[in-house]
Structures are given as C-alpha cells and as structure tokens.
C-alpha cells in the first residue's frame, strides 16, 4: 500500500480542526490557472499553510513536494505546488512578520519566464 504523509512546514492557523482539514485539502483553486496571460491574480491572504508532502508511489518511486494553501477572508481557498511561488510567498510572510505587519494582506501572483522554463514560466508572489 502506498504511503501518503503530510507535515506542516509553516502556518498561521492555530485551530487544530482547521489545520487538520487543510492537511487533507485537495479542493482548491489552482493559483497558476487563475493568472491571466501577461497579468496577475490578486488575492487577499488571511490564513495560510505550507505543507511538506511525501507520497510513496509504487510504480515511479517516492515523490516529495510542497503545497501552499491560502485562505481569503471569504473562505475561498487557493493553492499551488510551484516551488518558486512557495519560496517567494514564504519570504514575503517572513518580511511581514519581521515588520509586525498583520494579515490579511492583498497579494498578487504572476508568472515570469526563465532561462530553464519551457512554456508557463515561474510563478512568483508579491504584495499588491
């Protein structure tokens, strides 16, 4: 039987029940799909979790990846497994915390082409 394990790397969610729901969440809007060509997707981040996921897959070996889940004040959920999006989001959150700037904050997600990317490019997250 394949093993699936989720650990929380970083979060501002304090309620255990909500955090348990987030760890099992697969029903979210994909941030990458919401970014229009040449534009950005603006969202209001109130709660978030960065998850480290380990999945043993029988045919192709183990797969380790991270997932970002963001919840806005209306309860809409957005997510991505883009490493560049997760890294820029985490850096932004750390900066907000160091300057004592509370959530919610309007943020935007946008795509940038890179030397190594074919097609879509990197997803980055910044303040709106």
Show the residue positions of the predicted features.
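Generic N-terminal initiation segments characterized by hydrophobic and/or small/turn-forming residues
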Residues: 16-17, 89, 93, 124
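OB-fold ssDNA-binding interfaces and closely related basic DNA-contact patches used
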Residues: 1-75, 126-128
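GIY-YIG-like beta-to-alpha core
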Residues: 78-91
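Short nucleic-acid-contacting surface segments enriched for D/E, G, S/T with interspersed K/R
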Residues: 88-108
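Alpha-helical protein-protein interaction elements
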Residues: 40, 70, 81-84, 114
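Beta-strand-rich binding-surface signature
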Residues: 67, 106, 121
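OB-fold/S1-family single-stranded nucleic acid-binding modules
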Residues: 110-128
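Compositionally biased, low-structure terminal segments
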Residues: 29, 42-44, 90, 100, ...
């Amino acid at each position: 039987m394949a093993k699936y394990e989720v650990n929380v790397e970083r979060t501002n969610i304090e309620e255990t029940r909500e955090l348990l729901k987030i760890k099992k969440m697969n029903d979210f809007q994909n941030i990458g799909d919401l970014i229009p060509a040449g534009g950005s997707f603006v969202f209001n981040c109130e709660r978030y979790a960065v998850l480290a996921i380990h999945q043993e897959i029988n045919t192709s070996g183990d797969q380790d990846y991270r997932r970002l889940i963001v919840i806005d004040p209306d309860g809409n959920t957005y997510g991505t497994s883009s490493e560049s999006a997760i890294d820029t989001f985490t850096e932004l959150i750390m900066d907000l915390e160091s300057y004592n700037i509370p959530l919610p904050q309007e943020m935007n997600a946008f795509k940038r082409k890179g030397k190594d990317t074919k097609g879509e490019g990197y997803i980055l997250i910044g303040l709106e």
